[in-house]
């Protein structure tokens, strides 16, 4: 009998970025016409702009989306774990991340060495974050998704997806 192995466990997202959780809503992400599935490879040049992240849920519910790289600066020495790439808050359910408020501007993947994981984590908010209630993190390196969620009382994630990216070879002219 075949057993299902969660790709978030295999990809070490559960454990290194988030704790074990039960997904409670649907979240899809895409760069252009390329859908993101757990563990897929996305070229950095294809991810220069924020992905389209659609979430289910009721219109009255609000969500926070966080994107990090737990492998910065390199998978063998992740001394900047987690590197923060994006935070969007107050996303209404049943819409997409563009309907929320960008707290930390999107920064696309820029892996320098090795294959990096990029993790999109969605949390349900207890209430709307009003101006001034949230302070953006001081720095992008060494961000901690769990600590951010705990501080803002977000609880466990409602959905998570991750993709891989690696440095693209430079065009060589001869």
Swiss-Prot record:
Chain coiled-coil ranges: none
Pfam families registered for this protein in UniProt: PBP
Disulfide bond residue pairs: none
Protein's name according to its UniProt entry: Protein MOTHER of FT and TFL1 homolog 2
SUPFAM superfamilies referenced in this protein's UniProt entry, alphabetically: PEBP-like (SSF49777)
Gene: MFT2
InterPro entries linked to this entry: PEBP (IPR008914), PEBP-like_sf (IPR036610), PEBP_euk (IPR035810), Phosphatidylethanolamine-bd_CS (IPR001858)
Source lineage: Eukaryota, Viridiplantae, Streptophyta, Embryophyta, Tracheophyta
UniProt family annotation: Belongs to the phosphatidylethanolamine-binding protein family.
CDD domains: PEBP_euk
Function: May form complexes with phosphorylated ligands by interfering with kinases and their effectors.
Induction context: Induced by abscisic acid (ABA).
């Amino acid at each position: 009998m075949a057993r299902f192995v969660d790709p978030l466990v295999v990809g070490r997202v559960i454990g290194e970025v988030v704790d074990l959780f039960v997904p409670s809503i649907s979240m899809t992400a895409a760069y252009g016409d390329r859908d993101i599935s757990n563990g897929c490879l996305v070229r950095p040049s294809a991810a220069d702009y924020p992905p389209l992240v659609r979430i289910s849920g009721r219109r009255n519910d609000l969500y926070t989306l966080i994107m990090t790289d737990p492998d910065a600066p390199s998978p063998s020495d992740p001394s900047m774990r987690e590197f923060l790439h994006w935070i969007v808050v107050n996303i209404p359910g049943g819409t997409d991340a563009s309907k929320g408020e960008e707290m930390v501007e999107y920064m696309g993947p820029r892996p320098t060495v090795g294959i990096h994981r990029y993790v999109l984590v969605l949390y349900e908010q207890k209430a709307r974050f009003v101006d001034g209630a949230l302070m953006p993190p001081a720095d992008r390196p060494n961000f901690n998704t769990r600590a951010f969620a705990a501080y803002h009382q977000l609880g466990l994630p409602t959905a998570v997806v991750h993709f891989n990216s690696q440095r693209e070879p430079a065009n060589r002219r001869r």
